[in-house]
Each structure stands twice: as structure tokens, then as C-alpha cells.
């Protein structure tokens, strides 16, 4: 964004200092919590506000959209990109007992219990309209779980998403499963135990191993729905 719009000032926030050090001169990172009542900025400060993949981050994402409306200039735009946590399938290759589907269901339960819901994507458009945005638009895209698709573009996206899911699976799981659902660590992550008889695994130890196998199974044609919603703050407020 900073490279494409060199005359703009780009401000980004996060809860911790994990941002790269090498960024365009017009890009600035701040440690801040968007759920705070005051963004420490004057009203109508921004021309454009963008959010992406914040499912599970806030108790009320609709309130974040309301805040975005408040801090936008009249005529400014806000855009949100969120994926539905529950995977979909169009050809019945994803059974009800598919391990990754079960994993997402447990994650949803934990997120609701923690008052940080994951299922927000399908509510974005309504929240935008309720906040006062006009000309609200929505597009829904398919993001394959892995590279199962015959379409080259979707295959590439799926391969990238599979890598992301596999690399982040343990981290995604630990907080929800251990702190919220009270699973023990060995119920969450597998550890191979060596013995004179070879490698042996117990049921509780193979949980994430099975999830990883499910994610990489090309025979299951599953995908996430990605909702992209944007809207304009009216030039004049009634």
C-alpha cells in the first residue's frame, strides 16, 4: 500500500511489535488495541481503513466497524476481508467426520466460550449498513484448503493456504484447546515415542497429526469462503 501510494501516509496497528523493520518511509506501525473506545486520533482522520482476518480477535467486530466509520472522513472507504472458519465442499468429498472439520468446530466452540467469535464473515455486510455506510458491496471468494483444484489460480492459492494452515496449526490450537477447552498438551500435539518395538502413538497424541493429514488430503475438495466487504461513508451525514 505504501509503495503503490507514495504520497499517502499509511498507519497500521498491532498488539505487539512484530512488524518488519524495512518498510516504505510513508508506512508507520503503532502498538495499539483497536477495541479501545478511543483510537487516540481525531474524528474523520482517515481516507481509507482496511481490516483483514481478524476473526477471533474481538468480542464485537461490529463495534470495530462503527469505530472505523467514526474515524473516516466523509467520502472515505472502509474494507474488511474475513474467511468463514467452517470449510465448505461442493461435491460431497468432505464427510461430516473429516478431522479438519471437527477441528474447526472445536475452535468455534472455544472462541464462543472466550467471547471472541470466529464466525463473523457472513455478518460483515449487515454491520457495515448498520454503521451507516452506503454503497456497501460484497464479494465472496473460494480459498481451497490445499492444491486439489484443477484451476491453476485456485491450485496456487490452495497450496499457499495449506502451507499457512500447517505451519500455524499448533499455534492456532494451543490457546483454544489448552486454556479454554482445558485439554492437556499431549491431547493437542503428537509426540512420537520411541521404544524397542519401534514408533508407537496413542490416540490422544495423534490429534494434530490427523488434522495435518486431513488438511493435505487432495481427495477432499474443501475450501473456505472469503467475504470481502467495503462501503463508503456518506459525504453528508443526515
PLM region descriptions:
Residues 14-17, 34-36, 51, 66, ...:
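Eukaryotic intrinsically disordered and solvent-exposed regulatory patches
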Residues 9, 76-77:
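Short glycine-centered segments of the SAM/dcSAM-binding site in methyltransferase folds
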Residues 4, 64-74, 127, 131:
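Conserved helix-to-beta-strand junction in the class I
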Residues 1, 6-7, 13, 30-32, ...:
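Conserved NB-ARC/NACHT P-loop NTPase core of NLR-like innate immune receptors
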Residues 131-238:
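C-terminal lobe and adjacent flexible extensions of AdoMet/dcAdoMet transferase-like proteins
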Residues 1-48, 62-66:
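Class I SAM-dependent methyltransferase SAM/SAH-binding core
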Residues 44-53, 79:
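Short SAM/SAH-binding signature in class I
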Residues 56, 62, 77-181:
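Conserved catalytic/acceptor-binding region of the Class I
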Amino acid at each position: 500500500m505504501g509503495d503503490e501510494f507514495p504520497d499517502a501516509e499509511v498507519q497500521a496497528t498491532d498488539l505487539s511489535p512484530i512488524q518488519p523493520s524495512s518498510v516504505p518511509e510513508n508506512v508507520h506501525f503503532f502498538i495499539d488495541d483497536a477495541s479501545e473506545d478511543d483510537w487516540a486520533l481525531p474524528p474523520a482522520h482517515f481516507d481509507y481503513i482496511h481490516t483483514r482476518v481478524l476473526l477471533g480477535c474481538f468480542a464485537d467486530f461490529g463495534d470495530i466497524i462503527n469505530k472505523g466509520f467514526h474515524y473516516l472522513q466523509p467520502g472515505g472507504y472502509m474494507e474488511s476481508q474475513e474467511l468463514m472458519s467452517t470449510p465448505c465442499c461442493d461435491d460431497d468429498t468432505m464427510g461430516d467426520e473429516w478431522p479438519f472439520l471437527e477441528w474447526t468446530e472445536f475452535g468455534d466452540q472455544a472462541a464462543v466460550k472466550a467471547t471472541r467469535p470466529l464466525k463473523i464473515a457472513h455478518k460483515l455486510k449487515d454491520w457495515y449498513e448498520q454503521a451507516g455506510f452506503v454503497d456497501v458491496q460484497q464479494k465472496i471468494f473460494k480459498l481451497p484448503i490445499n492444491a486439489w483444484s484443477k484451476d491453476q489460480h485456485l491450485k496456487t492459492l490452495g497450496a499457499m493456504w495449506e502451507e499457512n494452515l500447517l505451519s500455524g496449526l499448533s499455534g492456532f490450537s494451543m490457546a483454544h484447546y489448552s486454556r479454554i477447552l482445558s485439554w492437556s498438551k499431549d491431547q493437542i500435539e503428537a509426540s512420537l515415542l520411541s521404544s524397542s518395538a519401534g514408533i508407537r502413538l496413542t490416540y490422544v497424541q495423534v490429534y494434530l497429526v490427523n488434522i495435518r493429514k486431513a488438511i493435505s488430503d487432495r481427495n477432499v475438495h474443501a475450501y473456505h469462503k472469503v467475504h470481502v466487504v467495503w462501503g463508503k461513508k456518506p459525504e453528508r451525514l443526515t
